[in-house]
A protein has these predicted regions:
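Bacterial Sec-dependent N-terminal signal peptides
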Residues: 1-28
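Membrane-proximal, proline-rich intrinsically disordered regions
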Residues: 19-71, 320, 421, 425, ...
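Conserved, well-structured interaction surfaces
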Residues: 44, 83-160, 182-190, 206-207, ...
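Alpha-helical solenoid repeat scaffolds, predominantly canonical TPR units
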Residues: 115, 192, 199, 206, ...
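Alpha-helix C-terminal capping/termination sites
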Residues: 155, 162, 229, 263, ...
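Hydrophobic-face positions in mid-chain alpha helices that act as interaction patches
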Residues: 209, 221-236, 240-250, 262-389, ...
Length: 491
């Protein structure tokens, strides 16, 4: 592996505006790693480069969210022309076009992992005095790098291996932890989960030294986490510490760990991590009581189109300045000439509900507004949601229902006792639904959670993994994981 990486040369502005984010930067040069890591700014640039890797169209900027991964979840209506996506919808994974998409997902994800490893190896032994905030900033960068390495490996596991509940002891994917390594042994599903868990626990310990300390917790409230409002607790001249929702913050690592435990069938541990996120609070800059960090976006009727991503509940997201343009060709409103249209069956998904506010985010013809251009001041047009509060509720709901348990949820200074059904209904209520169907067994609960996932995660690449986790199929021919790219079969 060459000791050179693409990095982002960042020009920080001293004045914060609504469209300025630490992540809004462009690649300009290739710099030797020895030069890059001479300064604290170089470490920041290297970390930023990983996030930019992840936002590329071959990864979460398209294929691993609203592209291929939502296609194989059967989210979209049938395509009228033969394309790579129409072949993926039929699980024709041996086709040349689909192989190309799968290969790019694999190779670009492992490239991002390589960049994580380079950063980790460099920052571990670095003198804290190199960083503006010393040890605290060093821990922050290292914690994010560990968490991102775990996050990326976990998605490779979800895409290229069977679910833990049905997995055998075969090796499915490698887990790279050393920069420069060209090959690592292929590990079993359980072994990969163990390494992901270890990296996330490391990350939580490191990130806690910044995100949960004193007034820093205020940065995880929505107005600062995603909207970027001026924060009286943070130096306004240093944008590196703004927009924690666009970075792998402490609660993003916690939510990822909840996702991992849930996928692995470790319900009690998943519930514990998810509840930590649900109950998270931050310092209120107005001097009042602490506020919930993550909430369900409050909207009234059609005004929901001003907040199409319902971002108050987004725990972690990526920034893509080209997201709207990348999405335009696939919807009539974009005026693009692409023959592929990403249309969903609105009536089937929302069951003609007059209450579900998410239904306003899909046009009558079935096109999602989530990644189209918006005029609302809080539209966060560049945001690609990666982990949501609703997922944490689904995790807790599942565990409580299966085990006949209840938990205490703190909200607005009050403690409420919830069981599994109430946790699921809280998501529905948060989206405007007041009438809920009956659930009488685990199978019906799983079906109900899948229905909510279809409504909640349009364009976010998560629905497929609910089918996989519950071993259910929207179509009989669904295949639960990709074959390895051809160039990996030599291992």
């Amino acid at each position: 592996m060459r000791n050179r990486i693409w990095i982002i040369m960042v020009l920080f502005s001293l004045l914060l505006s609504a469209c300025e984010k630490w992540l809004d930067v462009k690649p300009e040069d290739e710099v030797d790693a020895n030069v890059l890591f001479e300064t604290g700014q170089g470490y920041r640039n290297a970390l930023n480069g990983v996030y930019n890797n992840m936002a590329e169209v071959s990864m979460y900027g398209k294929e691993m969210t609203w592209g291929a991964v939502d296609v194989i979840a059967q989210l979209y209506s049938s395509f009228t022309q033969v394309t790579a996506w129409s072949k993926m919808m039929d699980y024709a994974y041996e086709d040349t076009d689909t192989k190309s998409i799968i290969s790019s997902i694999w190779s670009d994800t492992y490239t991002a992992i390589t960049n994580c490893n380079n950063l980790i190896e460099q920052v571990v032994g670095e003198d804290p005095d190199v960083f503006v905030l010393g040890e605290m900033e060093r821990n922050l960068i290292l914690g994010e790098a560990y968490a991102l390495r775990a996050f990326l490996h976990f998605d490779m596991l979800r895409l290229f291996a069977p679910a833990p509940a049905v997995a055998d002891n075969r090796g499915y994917i490698p887990y790279f932890e050393k920069h420069g390594s060209l090959a690592e042994p292929y590990l079993s599903v359980d072994s990969v989960v163990g390494r992901v868990e270890r990296d996330l626990l490391r990350a939580k310990d490191l990130l806690a030294t910044y995100d949960t300390v004193g007034d820093n917790s205020s940065a995880l409230l929505t107005v600062y986490r995603l909207n970027g409002d001026p924060n009286p607790f943070v130096d306004i001249e240093d944008l590196f510490f703004f927009y924690r929702g666009y970075r792998m913050n402490y609660y993003a690592a916690t939510a990822t760990l909840a996702r991992v435990y849930d996928y692995a069938g470790r319900g009690e541990e998943a519930c514990k991590q998810a509840l930590e996120v649900i109950n998270a609070t931050g310092v209120n800059s107005n001097g009042g009581a602490r506020k919930q960090c993550f909430t369900f976006t409050e909207v009234v009727g059609i005004t929901i189109v001003e907040t199409p991503k319902l971002h108050d509940g987004v725990i972690f997201g990526l920034s893509s300045s080209t997201l709207i343009d990348d999405y335009k060709p696939y919807v009539p409103e974009g005026g693009g000439g692409n023959v592929t249209r990403l249309r969903v069956d609105k009536d089937a998904i929302y069951e003609k509900s007059v209450e579900d506010q998410r239904a306003h985010l899909v046009t009558t013809e079935g096109y999602s507004l989530k990644y189209q251009e918006h005029r609302g001041s809080d539209a966060v047009d560049d945001l690609i949601p990666m982990i949501r509060l609703s997922e944490m509720y689904f995790i807790v709901s599942d565990y409580l229902y299966r085990n006949g348990k209840t938990v205490e949820i703190a909200k607005d200074g009050e403690i409420n006792v919830k069981d599994g059904i109430r946790m699921l209904n809280d998501v529905r209520f948060g989206r405007g639904i007041t009438v809920h169907g009956q659930i009488s067994n685990v199978d019906e609960l799983e079906d109900a959670i899948i229905r909510e996932a279809r409504r909640e995660f349009i364009g976010e690449g998560q629905l497929f993994f609910y089918y996989k986790k519950y071993n259910k199929k929207p179509v009989d021919k669904m295949v639960y994981y990709f074959p390895l790219p051809d160039n990996e079969l030599i291992h």
